[in-house]
Curated annotation (Swiss-Prot):
SUPFAM superfamilies: EF-G C-terminal domain-like, P-loop containing nucleoside triphosphate hydrolases, Translation proteins. This is Peptide chain release factor 3. It is found in: Cytoplasm. GTP binds at residues 18-25, 95-99, 149-152. The lineage of its organism: Bacteria, Pseudomonadati, Pseudomonadota, Betaproteobacteria, Burkholderiales. PROSITE patterns: G_TR_1, G_TR_2. One of its GO terms (molecular function) is GTP binding. Increases the formation of ribosomal termination complexes and stimulates activities of RF-1 and RF-2. It binds guanine nucleotides and has strong preference for UGA stop codons. It may interact directly with the ribosome. The stimulation of RF-1 and RF-2 is significantly reduced by GTP and GDP, but not by GMP. Disulfide bonds: none annotated.
Length: 533
């Protein structure tokens, strides 16, 4: 039991959230590099050459230079603790799509982490997608570390950036490092906690030229000249005006420790990784419909937060990503697949390093394992050693955009149905079958998703499909007795469809129609979100 507790205590499971182009993929690469997980960081700007960013592995992502699915990467990281001891953590990094069209996949990924790193572009500050994602984290009081990136560019002043984060995101900022100059004048950072100056070297392998002790170090004046005295005055003001770090406030999602750096130059990344391991919580307790599951419980529990089709086109596979919530997983163990009511032996689970995969011999609470899925596992499904649990809080959103699928080759209907069904099981799109026709209607939270589906249908399933506009304003899941649902079908069946799980959905042609239908059928609930479990 003590080895179980110590293994779980080593785990840190987090996601990186940001607006597109804030440098999230670059930061992900550099964290992996500092963790020793990759030999060469696949620099994003060189993406059209042979080297693609390690976490952007799907063909479409490589073409577009954006992350459209969530990747999972695990690596060990050895660091020195504040008291000088060596400590090894197991880091589980979940890379999430930064593009606004993939918010639903990102949302679900954020249900599988214990903390998050928010990347802010020093030039652009807080942007729209950052606000949305932080609000998602806030629903679960997820602890947030902040990395203000691109200090090597001419950006906004650090005080202005912190003020904006506090005002717009309504979260206290506690600066842990402070920049010395910006843009061409950027010389490094001062560490407010341990009174050290870390000097910037854009040509050094790790971005650092030297680390000096103390602000009063005469060496600082020799290297920085007049900037040294400016730094001392600025730090005195910062200490007086800013919040000091409060670990309880951080763990409750009320305060964010802030680090400054330049991911593309490797600068500030190692400090962030050290802080992530030092400050972020180990795996946390999880709510179910019947009780709270503690990570140190000896029996295995886990839930599916993501399904990905065709991670390896050679294998035509589907993988269910399972967050381990408690206990220890061992290869070959028999687990209850709660929703199916069946016990299954898991012999070929895998761990991830983007698309690289290894068979998992064991995994602990906080880890992410991949379970091969032959169509029986769905988002939100739970695996246990026998207890019929359901983890709560894994949502599905009503789509905002709808398209009807049309085939250029009518003989490919079966392949189209199979492709749409499998891609919908990933949860980024939803498939609806109207009761009154043979149409296949696709719904998504972002318009770009239809391009992704068309591309993947063509390249992974050999189906050439066109997505035409479909007269639908919104979708609502129907909640009520079978008799009440039948009444609605009798009167307005042309607007009722079945979703991928076989549940009834009302596809409203307009918001006015939805309001009138709700008034006519007050006994039915028209649900905008549905908990997958």
């Amino acid at each position: 039991m003590s080895s179980l507790v110590s293994e779980i205590a080593r785990r840190r499971t987090f996601a990186i959230i940001s607006h597109p182009d804030a440098g999230k993929t670059t930061l992900t690469e550099k964290l992996l590099w500092f963790g020793g997980a990759i030999q060469v960081a696949g620099e994003v700007r060189a993406r059209k050459a042979d080297r693609h960013a390690t976490s952007d592995w799907m063909e479409l992502e490589k073409q577009r230079g954006i992350s459209v699915t969530s990747s999972v990467m695990q690596f060990p990281y050895r660091r020195e603790t504040a008291d000088g001891k060596a400590q090894e953590n197991i880091v589980n990094l979940l890379d999430t799509p930064g593009h606004e069209d993939f918010s639903e996949d990102t949302y679900r990924t954020l249900t599988a982490v214990d903390s998050a790193v928010m990347v802010i572009d020093s030039v652009n500050g807080v942007e729209a997608q950052t606000i949305k994602l932080l609000n998602v984290c806030r629903l679960r009081d997820t602890p947030i570390l902040t990395f203000i990136n691109k200090l090597d560019r001419e950006g906004r002043s650090p005080i202005e950036l912190l003020d904006e984060i506090e005002e717009v995101l309504q979260i206290q900022c506690a600066p842990m490092t402070w920049p010395i100059g910006m843009g061409k004048a950027f010389r490094g950072v001062y560490h407010l906690i341990n009174d050290k100056v870390q000097l910037f070297d854009p040509h050094g392998e790790k971005g650092t030229a030297a680390i000096l002790d103390g602000l009063d170090n005469p060496e600082l004046d020799r290297i920085l000249g007049s900037q040294a005295e400016e730094l001392r005055i600025e730090i005195e003001l910062v200490r007086g005006a800013s919040h000091t770090f409060d670990k309880d406030a951080f763990l409750n999602g009320k305060q964010t420790p802030v680090y400054f750096g330049s991911a593309i130059n490797n600068f500030g990344v190692q400090s962030l990784l050290d802080a992530l391991c030092e400050l972020s919580p180990p795996p946390l307790a999880r709510n179910t419909d019947s009780r709270v599951v503690e990570p140190q419980e000896p029996k295995f529990t886990g839930f599916v937060f993501k399904i990905q089709a065709n991670m390896d086109p050679r294998h035509r596979d589907r993988i269910a990503f399972v967050r381990v919530c408690s206990g220890r997983f061992e290869r070959g163990m028999k687990l209850l697949h709660v929703s199916a009511g069946k016990t299954v032996a898991i012999n070929n689970a895998i761990t991830f390093m983007a698309q690289d995969r290894n068979t998992t011999e064991e995994a602990y609470a906080g880890d992410i394992i991949g379970v091969p899925n032959h169509g029986t596992i769905r988002l939100g499904d739970v695996f246990t050693e026998g207890e019929p649990l359901k983890f709560t809080g894994i949502p599905s959103f009503a789509p905002e955009f709808f398209r009807r699928a049309r085939l250029n080759n009518p003989l490919k209907v079966k392949q189209l149905q199979k492709g749409l069904q499998q891609l919908a099981e990933e949860g980024a799109t939803q498939m609806f079958r109207p009761l009154a026709s043979n149409d296949l209607v696709l719904g998504a939270v972002g318009i770009l998703q239809f391009d992704v589906v068309a591309h993947r249908l063509e390249h992974e399933y050999g189906v050439d499909a066109i997505f035409e506009s479909h007269e639908c304003a919104t979708a609502r899941w129907l909640k009520g007795t079978p008799a009440e649902i039948e009444k609605l079908i009798a009167k307005a069946g042309h607007n009722v469809a079945l979703d991928g799980a076989g549940d009834h959905v009302y596809l409203a042609p307009s918001m006015v129609n939805l309001r009138l239908t709700q008034e006519r059928f007050p006994e039915l609930q028209f649900m905008e979100t549905r908990e997958i479990v």
